[in-house]
UniProtKB/Swiss-Prot annotation:
The UniProt record lists the keyword Ubl conjugation: no
Pfam families, per database record: Ldl_recept_a (PF00057)
InterPro entries: IDLSRF-like_peptide, LDL_receptor-like_sf, LDLR_class-A_CS, LDrepeatLR_classA_rpt
Protein name: IDLSRF-like peptide
Tissue: Expressed in central brain, antennal and optical lobes, in gnathal, thoracic and abdominal ganglia and in the retrocerebral complex (at protein level).
Organism: Camponotus floridanus (Florida carpenter ant)
Disulfide topology: 46-60, 54-73, 67-84
Methyltransferase keyword on record: no
Length: 201
């Protein structure tokens, strides 16, 4: 890489000298070979030591540069708040599978106990399991989640109270909304994963 850069720098110096000497020749100079090493890095598959490919410009960067506070991708995608939140949360596929298993085990309206009236009929009014799983993965806070799924304020406050009951170990409140003893473990497991990543902040 250093040799290629140095050769490129010499070539650029010669080209600029030629431009100064022959101003009309500026348009005829092809610098694509000078920039070729940059383009190949962006168009090839990423190396294991730089496995993240920026979606906008195709630049490969190290995982350590994701969500570090300094944009490395041209469009700043490596610092996108949704990406950084999703990096801390369980994968969307895992969340969707977990939601599906809750629905399969406890019935199509089970998640209404957590998310409110719009969660009836296997979450169809909220856009389905996949959309809810994505919103849980990308939403930094419960407020962001409510906005992403257009939850009513009452449903959002209900969800917040369920989270607080889980966090505080208030089994009485959870039972009062119809969560049975046999279901408590599943609900607690699911909600604690979100709480640990700042969902209630």
């Amino acid at each position: 890489m250093v040799r290629r850069f140095c050769n490129g720098a010499v070539a650029l110096g010669i080209a600029l000298t030629a431009c100064a000497a022959f101003p009309r020749a500026i348009m005829a100079i092809d610098l694509s070979r000078f920039y070729g090493h940059i383009n190949t890095k962006r168009s090839d598959a990423c190396h294991p030591y730089e496995p993240f490919k920026c979606p906008g410009d195709g630049l490969c960067i190290s995982i350590q540069y994701l969500c570090d506070g300094a944009p490395d991708c041209q469009d700043g995608y490596d610092e996108d708040s949704r990406l950084c939140t999703a990096a801390k949360r369980p994968p969307v596929e895992e969340t969707a599978t977990f939601l599906q298993s809750l629905l399969a085990s406890h019935g199509p309206n089970y998640l209404e106990k957590l998310f409110g009236n719009k969660a009836r009929d296997t979450l169809k009014p909220l856009g389905g399991v996949e959309k809810v799983a994505i919103a849980l993965s990308e939403s930094q806070t419960i407020e962001d989640f409510g906005a992403a799924l257009h939850l009513m304020r009452s449903d959002l406050e209900h969800l917040r109270s369920v989270f607080m009951a889980v966090e505080n170990g208030d089994l009485g409140m959870l039972k009062s909304i119809g969560i049975k003893d046999s279901e408590l473990g599943d609900v607690k497991f699911f909600l604690e994963k979100l709480v640990k990543t700042g969902f209630l902040d």
